[in-house]
Amino acid sequence: MKNLLKMSDLSPAELIHILDVAGQLKAQQKLGGTAPLLAGKSVALLFSKASTRTRTSFEVGVYQMGGLGNYMNTSELQAGRGEPLKDTARVLGRYYDCVVWRTYRQRDLEEFAELAGVPVINGLTDYAHPCQVLADLMTIREHRGTLAGQKLCFVGDGSSMANSLIAGGLLAGMQVTCVCPESYRPAADVLMFARKYGSQFHLTADPAEGVRDADVVATAVWNTAAPGTPESEQRLRDFVGYQLTGKLLEAAKPDAMVLHCLPAHRGEEISTAVFEQHAPEIFDEAENRLHVQKAVLAILLAGK
């Protein structure tokens, strides 16, 4: 693994190795601290979007492993005044051992990775959110003991979370169902990737069908438009019936897990009651962002 740009870049063995290392680092941290695996290393934390979990978990993770993490908002750099992306990549690659970038376009991230000359980690793009999905898979494995054969259902729009959960779940040997309205499907290349797995993947617009007998049901914000705008109102209409409610989850297994990448819009993609019922899993999931990201850094920079 040279970078972490999207889930489908990983092999099944690489994915499981990340989770194994994450588990080891989590156990070490609970016992008093992680070895200084990043001593003498510097990590650029480059953000073009607002962030709570991604920024803070990377900052804390780099610190816990003895490295230096520098947060930068791209609006405050020369890149925010028109300096070409390729120049920023080649400069930061000379200063830092690794770059984490949270941005909009996946193709910008991939161009950056080609030019930087150091490992690049996707902190979220409009296409992919691999760090979050690694945390999801770690959480499922902690609660269930295994990933292979588990039925994972994602309910929402064809967002970075859908794209990444589909790829990650299939690579981990899970049965994956994606539930979304017809006009909000995942990316075409993700669906092509998923179809290689045959009956292991299912796409439907019917929430009740999708969650039937699921071991894990995941969702994410699907109303990302500003409140009161025409787009927001349209999404509220289009996603009627797609909220995770107690009634909908009756079709899942009685002990089904519920995951949410946060932040949550209670009353839209998930009811308040369901969110609070499954808060222990959801906040385990949030904590595990720290541990999987430490694992990715340790693998890329310390040869773990």
Outline where the language-model segments fall.
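Short, structured coil segments at secondary-structure junctions
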Residues: 65, 95, 115-117, 172, ...
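Rossmann-like adenosine-cofactor binding region
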Residues: 195-273
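Anion-binding alpha/beta catalytic cores of soluble intermediary-metabolism enzymes, centered on
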Residues: 90, 97-168, 260
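Positively charged, low-complexity intrinsically disordered leader regions
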Residues: 1-56, 60
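Adenosine-phosphate binding glycine-rich loop
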Residues: 255-256, 261-304
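Active-site cofactor/substrate anionic-group-binding motifs, chiefly glycine-
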Residues: 42-43, 47-95
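Glycine-rich phosphate/diphosphate-binding loop of Rossmann-like nucleotide-binding domains
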Residues: 48-60, 142-220
